């Protein structure tokens, strides 16, 4: 994960055409996933994939809203996916180790295997979920911490604003998210929680120290360091 909003993204456009009822047809081209033609009506879907700075994570954009603006859902293991039919379905793929939902994308992290062989299974799962009109989450939404709180000190409010306006939009482009967890006024340490492609990314330490920490120290003199929790 690099904290450079202008960094080039590797984008592959994947056209996925679904014809219901029959199994997938192997075209011999890993970037195209087709289903056999049947008499039932077809549903066309275009799923875009983007590489992330974390080689173990790939970003899938279904061309429609996923969580919606400002909302995220992180599933670091299959045990945490109980309320999401899509997350549960993705974890049924043996190589999948983590799933993350952003505003309009899905990040999938693998434990092993080659993306060339893993992508068709993920694409088929995502496509089936949306074409069947299944809910993304079941039950009441979890309560989330308010971004801003009237009781926040001026320093905390300033830190939160910088994270919301400068950090989160940048890391979302890389398929992840960073959440403010706290500020220790006595030590000046800001605690952040990494999600999605950011978690376990080889470059996350560099991003925290060279990108986020330097920015926060520049704008908020009270900040001395940033650490992941």
PLM features: residue spans?
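Domain-level signature for proteins that mediate thiol-based redox and metal-cofactor handling
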Residues: 2-229
């Amino acid at each position: 994960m690099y904290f450079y909003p202008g960094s080039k993204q590797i984008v592959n456009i994947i056209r996925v055409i679904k014809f219901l009822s029959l199994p997938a047809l192997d075209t011999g081209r890993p970037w195209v996933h087709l289903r056999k033609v049947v008499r039932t009506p077809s549903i066309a879907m275009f799923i875009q994939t983007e590489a992330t700075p974390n080689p173990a994570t790939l970003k899938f954009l279904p061309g429609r809203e996923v969580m919606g603006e400002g909302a995220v859902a992180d599933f670091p293991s299959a045990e945490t996916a109980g309320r999401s039919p899509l997350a549960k379905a993705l974890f049924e793929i043996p190589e999948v180790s983590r799933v993350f939902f952003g505003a309009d994308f899905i990040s999938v992290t693998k434990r092993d295997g080659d993306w060339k062989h893993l992508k068709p299974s993920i694409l088929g799962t995502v496509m089936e979920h949306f074409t069947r009109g299944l809910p993304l989450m079941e039950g009441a939404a979890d309560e989330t911490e308010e971004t801003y709180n009237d009781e926040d000190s001026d320093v905390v409010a300033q830190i939160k604003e910088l994270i919301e306006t400068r950090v989160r939009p940048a890391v979302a482009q890389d398929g992840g998210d960073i959440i403010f967890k706290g500020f220790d006024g006595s030590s000046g340490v800001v605690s952040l929680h990494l999600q999605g492609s950011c978690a376990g990314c080889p470059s996350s330490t560099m991003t925290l120290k060279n990108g986020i920490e330097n920015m926060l120290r520049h704008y908020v003199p009270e900040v001395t360091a940033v650490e992941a929790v």
